Amino acid sequence: MSIDGRIAMKNGESRWITSKESREDVQKFRAKSSAILTSSATILNDDPLLNVRYKKFDKNTLSTFPKKIFQQPIRIIIDSKNRVKKSHKIIQTKEKILLMRLKLDKEIWPENTKQIIIKPYKENIDLLCVLKFLGNLEINNLWIEAGSTLSGCFLKLELIDEIIIYIAPKILGHEAKPLFIFNNQLKLFDCLKFDFKDIRQIGPDIRIKLEPKNKKF
């Protein structure tokens, strides 16, 4: 994100705010994860693959993730309105994908893609039920890469145990999209509080790790 807390321009343009070094660092966190979770909005806006670029790892990183035991993370997409289609790039990859939905569609999906029905919460997908479902699959290290709305929902529901932010030395202005969006306004007394756990420079950017003060996990 930018130093004024923005992750994309008003028109959705976001490539690239952070540096190549930061994007390479993200690959390591993806590789450590059992699964990567995103929203249908991110799929529609960016059409990402959300996999690990294993072939681009340097020797030191490859030693951490030996090819014999490395597995691509499962990709999980929160898709309450069935907006993800077979034409999206992520569906055309071979690794496993779970579409979290409120109802099935009539598409014939590739073998790697499964629709999972999750009960609703206020007309949206119940995120706590999603996490419980993933826990039953022994997915215990979940990496979330999503936009302002879904990320804000996870934070507001206190379902996050760590935040990792990459800050680029850029300013995008007040019309650009913020890092988090909450549906209801918080009073200062009720604001979400965090502890800094690690701060370091990654290329020209800064990476910050934070944990909630009242961590539940």
Curated annotation (Swiss-Prot):
Gene3D superfamilies assigned to the protein according to its UniProt record, in alphabetical order: Dihydrofolate Reductase, subunit A
Binding site for NADP(+): W16, D46, S80
Single GO term (MF): 5-amino-6-(5-phosphoribosylamino)uracil reductase activity
Catalytic reaction list: 5-amino-6-(5-phospho-D-ribitylamino)uracil + NADP(+) = 5-amino-6-(5-phospho-D-ribosylamino)uracil + NADPH + H(+)
Matches recorded under SUPFAM superfamilies: Dihydrofolate reductase-like
Principal EC category: oxidoreductase
Family of the protein in this entry: Belongs to the HTP reductase family.
Residues reported in the UniProt entry to bind substrate: S14, R30, L50, R53, E145
Gene Ontology terms: biological process: riboflavin biosynthetic process
Organism of derivation: Buchnera aphidicola subsp. Schizaphis graminum (strain Sg)
UniProt-listed InterPro entries: DHFR-like_dom_sf (IPR024072), Eubact_RibD (IPR004794), RibD_C (IPR011549), RibDG_C (IPR002734), Riboflavin_Biosynth_HTPR (IPR050765)
Pathway given in the UniProt record: Cofactor biosynthesis; riboflavin biosynthesis; 5-amino-6-(D-ribitylamino)uracil from GTP: step 3/4
Keyword terms of this UniProt record: NADP, Oxidoreductase, Riboflavin biosynthesis
Encoding gene, per UniProt annotation: ribD2
EC annotation from Swiss-Prot or TrEMBL: 1.1.1.193
Listed name of the protein: 5-amino-6-(5-phosphoribosylamino)uracil reductase
